[in-house]
């Protein structure tokens, strides 16, 4: 036929829609596992783009990046290659809340991710605005783009970000867009609704970008990169960055707030005509939200570089949808921004998302077999949350095609597991953001032990090398051996020992003890007393794990006991029981259980509206 296309141009194993942080991981995983993968985007020049803050990581999110890395993802490596300022956060607090946050060169990051996609074997990156999902007999079999070109696949992964019927707001002015400068995807929303998916609207926003030469940095507080070597990836060599791209801190003031209040009448959120009806992110409010809801004299503004060679700076903390006139006036009341020039205005964007209760924990749709969802389309916010979902969706699409066991991460072993469990068990009523407070066992889910927790899964699915997995196993073995050894290293009472302890502000010994017991003291580190150990530990990674365990042993052991109970409930499979036959279930519980379709008793216990009495009835039914 004259218009017939070659088979290899039409047929793929996996199709990924969208090249944001979720789409990249969703496409690389199956391609690396040997499956022919197509990834479609409306803008080939914005692959892996950072449309909001030019940063990766932060509390909880930085740990997610580490988890992505050890499961075989790419985000950590590319961040290490393109970061221009990096800091370990919460160093004055316990290890559970420490996390890396890096400013990236967003242009270099995007180009590097594009190169990685285009150089990956089994992967095709192509322009395409997807308008329709192809479904037959309850199974997905492909997509159709805006040119009427159809592609066939065994699995489709939607990672559409803010593009589904995206609409931008600057004051009372509106524009249809996936983000500033990009086309929205309108047909795809209709296709999903026609299939039977429930869609709702969320909103988010981004601040102005301003010209570097118009900023007076002398009125701001400088924040340099860390002096210690840092890396997100377990496969990168930690490095100290040059201090030539600092971030800067300034503050709003009452003049700023007065201008914001004066212009609220023109706000699409607070004006007489409320153009935006949808809910925005609780943990990243707009500046007008802050001024209206919080009675404070000032708010922090972090002024962040967007790249090594970029003349644009990002104003973290000043997201707004106020009209342009309000934006320029309020910025010029802020110290250091008195003569600022706006390069790109701030805006809010409203977009469609699906109810994530329509998904299994594999991120496959309950409605259509082989159709997966990841990222903001599931009601989440954040690059890291998106990338984590994308990786899990990509792995599970591949596992399904290859006939292998799916990857379902537990709450007790990863932040990605918490994220997906919350989405698929509780749903969302606002853009979801990961927080350390969402973790029941956060002392077990640390920045420093992501590889110990998850390497077995990365290796099992085939995305991390054998040598790395064996290295992790060896580390685990050595941690146990060294802890037992330190329990037996004797420290006698002596003037030498007590002099060391007094200098460290620690209580002198009255009787002999073990080195292990000295290390339990919060004011003492191993390096302080290493001369008391005849077999000195020189491996920094090994030493870090040992010290954390010894100092927090009581808390860690208590959590491990709680995890055992948690996993007992998680192991009771209820996915195949007929809920209509379970006696004495409340009507609400029966409805919620049918909607969520929990995999286990443990998941059922976390569904809002399901009571302990309902759980007892299910257990009683199973035991009979």
From Swiss-Prot:
GO terms for cellular component: cytosol. NAD(+) binds at residues 280-294. Signal peptide: none annotated. GO terms for biological process: tRNA methylation; tRNA wobble uridine modification. Its cofactor is FAD. FAD binds at residues 18-23. GO terms for molecular function: flavin adenine dinucleotide binding. NAD-binding protein involved in the addition of a carboxymethylaminomethyl (cmnm) group at the wobble position (U34) of certain tRNAs, forming tRNA-cmnm(5)s(2)U34. NCBIfam families: mnmG_gidA. This is tRNA uridine 5-carboxymethylaminomethyl modification enzyme MnmG. It comes from Thermosipho melanesiensis (strain DSM 12029 / CIP 104789 / BI429).
